[in-house]
C-alpha cells in the first residue's frame, strides 16, 4: 500500500506542535490554573503568546485537511463501510471514552469534551461525508481534476470561510470561533470552517499533481514569503482588534469594532490557507521516504 510520507510527517509534526501549544496553557489561562489550586500564576510573556498564535493559526486547518485526504484514501481502497467502522473505533470511541474520563475528573458528569472537541467534530464530518459521498454528483464533483483557476477559487473560499463562520455564529467578536466545551456547544460557523478544509483534503487526493507544483523551490519560496507576511499581518490585525484590552480575561465582555473584527477574520483565513500550502509543499520536497520515528508518531 502506497504511503504518503510527506503527509505522514506533516501529521506527526502537527501533533508535536500540539504539545508545544498546550504546555504553557496554565500561563495563558490563569483561571484554568486555579482549578489545580495554583493562584497568582505569572502570565505568559508576549513571545510565548506569539508562538501560540502562530501554531494555532494553521495546526487545526492542517489536521482537518489531512483528515479529508486520508478519509477518501481509505474509502477508495476499502469502501465506505470499512471506513465508517474504522473511524467509529479510532475516533468515535476514543472521543467518548477519554472525554468521559475528563468529564468525571471533577466529580460531575456534564458532557464536557475539553481538548477532544476536534475528535467530536471529526466524527460528525465522517458521518456526514460518508452519506454525502454516496451521491454520484457529489462524488464526481469532489474527484474532478482542477485547473489552476479553480484552485485559486478554492483558496479564496478557505479564506472567506472565516468571516462566514463569524456570520453563521452571529458574532463579530474575536472569540467567535471559540471551540466547543460540551457535546451540545456546537457552532455551525466552526463546523463550516473546519469541514471546508476537510473537503479540500478530499479534493487534494484527486489532484495530487499539486504536490509536484508546490514542492518546487520557487513555489516554496513564494509560499514562504506569503505565509510569513500573512502572519505578521495577522499579528497586526490582532493588535488593532484586541490591543485596546489591557487584560485578556476581559476580552469576552468587551465590545469591538465590527470592521476591525472582519479585517482580523480575513487575515486569519489568509494566514491559515497560506501556511497549509507552505507546509504541504515543504514536506513534499524534503520528506520522500519513511522513518521509524515518523511511523511511530503516526501510529500513536
Model-based region annotation:
Residues 1-300:
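Alpha-helical transmembrane segments and their immediate juxtamembrane cytosolic regions
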